[in-house]
């Protein structure tokens, strides 16, 4: 069979092989390292949420305390598991006690890693089961009420006020939109924490928070049932809190995520090593939750000539594909370029 584009399969295979070498060399680094955002994500998946009395997210409070005491290389899951054994409290109760200054994880008697892992196992399983149920709910909607014709119509809302976004999103769905993307407020990708609760003020977009995800998901389910068509929800899993937003999206049944470390490196000056570690964990989560990812090559073409710099886009797409495969993301969930 002749390709419609008359592309040379040997050149494509060669490019994939080169990209695989690049991704694998980085993967060896990724497998040996963690980041503060990856550790905060683990806390969120253990059910820890909320803020302390000065509005600091509890995952940040815990990870910062563990990091300052030199305990982060052991992994925050160990410290929470050990605290469960020593105090008899649940992860959320432990987090709240830390937030009030009543508990220091590092001063507790330290047990074995195996015992700590066993202590957190019920909470891990609870999170996984919740995400599985959300995936099943999506599939149930697609089976019962169906979806729009392809290609999907993609509409952006970005008022800064999640409640105004809901009105616009439902109106767009009634007019034929298949995917609603809620653009994040300007520079949220450079915040090293995820804001808490519903938000009504933003700049050029709306804050990505778990409560905002929940509000919009509920609204799109309602309008989807009304018009007889499942409406997908898209947000942005990139920047300094990439895996945290992926976890929040998995818990609240988002369907599509912009998910790319490379444009964060090129356009946001984000630490290369950190963001590639974060990307790996975020893509594991997206893969498990059935979330489609789109990468960020379109950003390159906002600053350069599309023809002259086409090779940079192709290189990024090949590398992104290989990183996604190493995270276990099915090809059906890979969207290259946005």
Segments (PLM) and residue ranges:
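Long, compositionally biased, glycine/small-hydrophobic-enriched stretches that function as flexible linkers
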Residues: 1-163, 171-176, 187-215, 237-257, ...
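Active-site/pore-lining binding-face segments in mid-to-C-terminal subdomains
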Residues: 182-184
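A glycine-rich, acidic short-motif signal
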Residues: 218-235
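Flexible, glycine/charged-enriched surface loops at secondary-structure junctions
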Residues: 226-230, 327-334
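Ligand/cofactor-recognition surfaces for anionic moieties
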Residues: 321
């Amino acid at each position: 069979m002749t390709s419609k584009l008359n592309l040379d399969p040997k050149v494509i295979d060669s490019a994939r092989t080169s990209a695989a070498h690049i991704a694998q060399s980085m993967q060896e680094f990724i497998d040996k390292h963690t980041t503060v955002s990856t550790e905060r994500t683990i806390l969120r998946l253990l059910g820890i949420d909320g803020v302390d009395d000065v509005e600091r997210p509890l995952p940040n409070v815990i990870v910062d305390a563990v990091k300052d005491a030199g305990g982060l290389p052991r992994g925050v899951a160990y410290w929470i598991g050990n605290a469960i054994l020593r105090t008899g409290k649940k992860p959320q109760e432990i987090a709240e006690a830390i937030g009030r200054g009543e508990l220091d994880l590092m001063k507790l008697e330290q047990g074995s890693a195996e015992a700590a892992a066993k202590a957190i196992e019920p909470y891990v399983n609870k999170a996984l089961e919740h995400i599985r149920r959300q995936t099943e709910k999506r599939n149930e909607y697609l089976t019962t009420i169906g979806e729009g014709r392809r290609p999907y119509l993609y509409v952006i809302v970005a008022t800064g006020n999640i409640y105004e976004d809901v009105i616009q999103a439902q109106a767009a769905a009634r007019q034929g939109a298949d995917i609603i993307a809620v653009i994040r407020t300007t520079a949220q990708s450079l915040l090293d924490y995820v804001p808490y609760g519903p938000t009504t003020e933003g700049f050029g977009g709306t804050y990505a928070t778990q409560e905002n995800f929940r509000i919009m998901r509920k609204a799109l389910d309602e309008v989807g049932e009304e018009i007889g068509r499942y409406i997908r929800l898209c947000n942005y899993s990139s920047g300094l809190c990439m895996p945290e937003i992926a976890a929040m999206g998995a818990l609240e049944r988002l369907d599509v995520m912009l998910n790319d470390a490379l444009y964060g490196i090129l356009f946001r000056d984000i630490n290369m090593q950190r963001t590639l570690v974060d990307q790996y964990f975020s893509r594991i989560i997206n893969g498990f939750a059935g979330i489609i990812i789109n990468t960020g090559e379109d950003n390159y073409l906002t600053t350069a000539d599309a023809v002259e710099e086409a090779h940079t886009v192709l290189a990024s797409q090949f590398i992104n594909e290989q990183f996604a495969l190493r995270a276990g993301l099915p090809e059906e969930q890979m969207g290259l370029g946005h």
